């Protein structure tokens, strides 16, 4: 008897595939920074409003992820890092991803406006548009400054959280925006240093592809030098304090040490050890952002006991 095997037929999408479509790792950062923005605002927010606000912000983040995955299907199919995502792997159809993204976008924006306020909903709508259209459809494929300008999309969540609580913006919410905005380039350029071939194969004009690794290393250092004083200065805003200052000094000292190491690295050495330093800097940058926002949250938690703030 002949053994007939049928290959190339995509498996039916399951619950986990639809969760992956929403980019849960990115969503976790969005939820955390938005939650910090909401909780440290100088007003009392009803727990139900806070819960629903964060829920719809998370939904908006997931919608952005689905729209991005729909548009980037051709790129994601080529890149090793992304080829197993639901859309490029064929598990979820592109049209289905588009429909889910649009539906969740509408639900998230409308419900956030009804549950909290129109300003917060407007910020969320702009964030989804900026990420899905300005970044994904335009910047990502046209300029090596894609993540510099596009980084604004990931920087809005704490502002949205603050707006849920207060209905507006402030120096503090703008600082949280700026912290993420300035953090984004060194974070993603360190990734691009050891993923250059992926971006090159997909035709994405990352800085490593258009200008080479040596220029990218210099940019990591320059943006780290700009980020460090900004991060430390946050200690002297209304959401800062001695705990945040100590945390920021330690983290930014380590950031600068790492950035200098990356800048001074010889390419032959980096290839020989498979970009060990660059991968370490990339992982550290994730902890860097979470710990800064954790310190901001800790300052707010300590204030009722007379321990937080100055």
From Swiss-Prot:
Subcellular localization: Cell inner membrane
Superkingdom assignment: Bacteria
Reactions catalysed: heme b + (2E,6E)-farnesyl diphosphate + H2O = Fe(II)-heme o + diphosphate
Keywords noted in UniProt: Cell inner membrane, Cell membrane, Heme biosynthesis, Membrane, Transferase, Transmembrane, Transmembrane helix
Record PROSITE patterns: UBIA
GO MF annotation: an example: protoheme IX farnesyltransferase activity
Gene Ontology CC annotations of this record: plasma membrane
Entry EC number(s): 2.5.1.141
Membrane topology, as annotated: Multi-pass membrane protein
Transmembrane segments: 26-45, 49-71, 95-115, 118-138, 147-167, 174-194, 220-240, 243-263, 289-309
Gene3D superfamilies documented for this protein: UbiA prenyltransferase
Gene Ontology BP terms: heme O biosynthetic process
Top EC class for this record: transferase
Pfam families: UbiA
Pathway(s): Porphyrin-containing compound metabolism; heme O biosynthesis; heme O from protoheme: step 1/1
InterPro entries: Protohaem_IX_farnesylTrfase (IPR006369), UbiA_prenyltransferase (IPR000537), UbiA_prenylTrfase_CS (IPR030470), UbiA_sf (IPR044878)
Cystine bridges: none
Similarity comment text for this entry: Belongs to the UbiA prenyltransferase family. Protoheme IX farnesyltransferase subfamily.
Function: Converts heme B (protoheme IX) to heme O by substitution of the vinyl group on carbon 2 of heme B porphyrin ring with a hydroxyethyl farnesyl side group.
Further details from the record: Carbon 2 of the heme B porphyrin ring is defined according to the Fischer nomenclature.
Subunit structure, as described in the record: Interacts with CtaA.
Protein name (record): Protoheme IX farnesyltransferase
